[in-house]
């Protein structure tokens, strides 16, 4: 896998790096217009989700919490965007895997009647096994397949033809291929953000073409009024993080295989709670894809998991069940937590510059 130089790749890993160093690095390795456009699209999608799903329904103390996380999330987005890397052309294998992931998930859920969260675990586990060392898939190909799998949970039927699902899978693979190594590097759960953006685009295209409002992902996420989602979201993030960093398990496999096991146990022991608690776990696992330059320790990964769970406690509105909502919310939690970590330990741009300079300039996260 070829390296993609970052905006600070020429800097030494020095904690004394300055704002001037960052400006110089940005001028030398500035993100391409495509990178900035994709970043803006992600910001619009995440902003719409946050305002419609959280801000408009918060009051009192909840509103203060949502405002704080929103401000931190915006700061985290800015810090991530200015350290984004030049974009590259999409790879055919990434686009193909996005399509295959969507088709496979669609066959499992709609043709074979497999429960949604089980389909997520099965599809992701297969993709993850293929991305093991010496396997045929690298990280970006497996991530594209995972993103396509989430978009494949769009429901076809009388008002949404199979063709829209195929378009969603192709778009997810295409976007992930370009976003992965370039846009918001190191930010966790971008797979979910890409799935949410892709699902939104397909939803709008279907409406503009005269199709009635298409059904959405049938995972109930409104009114997650069980505080159990806080520890479950944190546990999902931490278990996945440990598997990645202690056993060198590929991210997609580390996310999907435990999700399959956990949701299977829940289906036996607590069948009525699977949609809520299982969704909390799956969304939490996506946080573990954050790079160490953003969330460097297990403490910050766990904190992002708690923030994610706290956000989902207050989610509601017309976007309930929209493809990628859980992952997009996890992305917001990652950016907010990364900004908090930077404020606590950085206080200026120097340490962030040094961290990005030390981070491998490869699409590993």
Model regions: which residues?
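C-terminal transmembrane helix-loop-helix hairpin of multi-pass membrane proteins
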Residues: 12-77, 89-99, 106, 115-119, ...
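Glycine-rich, hydrophobic membrane-spanning regions of integral membrane proteins that mediate transport
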Residues: 81-86, 103
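Short, charged cytosolic
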Residues: 2-16
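Extracellular loop-to-transmembrane helix junctions
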Residues: 121-125
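Compositionally biased regions
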Residues: 3-4, 85, 365
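Short helix-coil junctions and helix-kink-helix linkers
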Residues: 110, 245-246
